[in-house]
């Protein structure tokens, strides 16, 4: 492959396309195109390689329905220095609309990526060398990687397929479908070198874990429980997971508690137990930014200190809606988005923690058919140097990946 280099402003602008309906305060361009549909998925995965040149993506032939077991998607990477050329990499049948197949670069590597797949009656993960094409298959799927790329934590994608459609994989039935809180399912630790896998936290264990004061003791009698949204801390010493439940006393909506734990599942800490915690990101090894609905302020973004009760609101007057948040390198700027407003507009913006100012970046129209399981959230992901952001958007008639230039704002 050619030697990587910095993406110049001239090269960026040369690829700009006419976008509608949308508005932008900074340069935006499509880096994928039809007739196939392209997206990446979640906001907390490494989409850019360490040089910022190669951007991972997924390609699919259809939209507006649930994936079927036989549906396969194509994985590839986009060369930002070669007219956004699509480079095919692999295929998989373990995927969903919100998080794809967990495709991401292995931390620190400029040649190895990892993704989930289905082989026979089990889900697996595959480490692929994008230069040589060599593959190594691990006996379990992955959810979140450690920062050194040596291990991962994962949960049961079979269970997610029916408890939270859009986040699990279709193709293998959940053996515990009728079990409200199984003992043999939960969170597994996966050694990415040896493939060794062990259950470290069971769903049953957490369903038996009460919420200490000041958190209320919510009633989940008769409910079905599951885990979702795992993320390892920047120093690899802790990880977050969400405990969710619905049904029974909880009714038809789901409730959520946020926990942290050590990589072996020990030293559990309840971060938020008020039932309405949502998207989150580690700011550093000790602090977590998350949307939560908690007294007395209600729905806001809050900064939690891990393994303590300290919490404070962040941007309460300007970050007023839930979104997919992350910190740009240096932690001054929070990158965030919104769900569609009443005009179906999704807003991409920065929040300056130094001044408390919200800086609009771009607005993308979300057609009404993009809703529920197959909605197309922006899910902003930043480049290693924090100067570029990618988003998924369907404003041009089908989901594609767009590159946003932050340099006019952050320099």
Residue ranges of model-derived segments:
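Surface-exposed loop and turn segments in beta-propeller and other repeat-based domains
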Residues: 32-37, 90-96, 198-221, 361-372
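Blade-terminus and WD-like Trp-Asp/Gly-His loop motifs, strongest in beta-propeller folds
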Residues: 46-54, 101-112, 144-151, 231-238, ...
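Conserved blade-ending motifs and adjacent loop-strand segments that build the rim/top face
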Residues: 315-324, 357-379
């Amino acid at each position: 492959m050619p030697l990587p280099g910095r993406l110049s402003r001239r090269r960026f602008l040369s690829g700009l396309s006419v976008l509608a309906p949308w508005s932008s305060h900074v340069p935006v361009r499509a880096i994928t195109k039809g007739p196939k549909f392209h997206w990446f998925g979640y906001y907390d995965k490494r989409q850019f390689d360490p040089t910022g040149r190669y951007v991972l993506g997924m390609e699919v032939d259809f939209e507006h329905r649930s994936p079927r077991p036989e549906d396969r998607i194509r994985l590839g990477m986009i060369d930002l220095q070669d007219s956004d050329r699509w480079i095919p990499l692999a295929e998989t049948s373990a995927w969903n609309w919100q998080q794809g197949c967990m495709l991401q670069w292995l931390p620190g590597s400029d040649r190895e990526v990892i993704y989930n797949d289905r082989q026979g009656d089990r889900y697996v993960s595959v480490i692929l060398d994008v230069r040589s094409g060599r593959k190594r298959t691990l006996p379990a799927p992955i959810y979140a990687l450690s920062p050194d790329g040596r291990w991962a934590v994962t949960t049961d994608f079979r269970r997610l397929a029916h408890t939270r459609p859009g986040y699990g994989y279709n193709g293998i039935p959940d053996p515990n479908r009728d079990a409200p809180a199984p003992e043999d399912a939960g969170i597994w630790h996966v050694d990415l070198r040896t493939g060794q896998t062990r259950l470290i936290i069971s769903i049953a264990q957490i369903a038996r874990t009460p919420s200490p004061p000041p958190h209320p003791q919510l009633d989940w009698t008769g409910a079905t429980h599951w885990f979702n949204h795992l993320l390892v801390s920047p120093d690899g010493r802790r990880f977050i997971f969400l405990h969710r439940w619905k049904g029974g006393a909880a009714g038809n909506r789901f409730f959520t508690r946020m926990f942290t734990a050590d990589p072996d599942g020990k030293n559990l800490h309840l971060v938020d137990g008020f039932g309405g915690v949502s998207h989150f990101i580690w700011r550093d090894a000790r602090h977590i930014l998350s949307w939560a609905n908690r007294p007395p302020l209600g729905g806001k973004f809050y900064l939690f200190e891990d393994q303590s009760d300290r919490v404070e609101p962040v941007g309460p007057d300007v970050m007023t809606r839930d979104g997919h948040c992350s910190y740009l390198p240096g932690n001054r700027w929070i990158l965030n988005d919104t769900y569609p407003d009443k005009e179906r507009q999704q807003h991409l913006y920065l929040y300056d923690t130094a001044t408390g100012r919200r800086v609009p970046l771009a607005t993308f129209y979300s057609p009404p058919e993009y809703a529920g399981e197959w909605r197309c959230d922006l899910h902003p992901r930043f480049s290693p140097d924090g100067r570029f952001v990618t988003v998924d958007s369907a404003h041009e008639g089908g989901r594609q990946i767009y590159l946003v230039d932050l340099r006019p704002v952050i320099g």
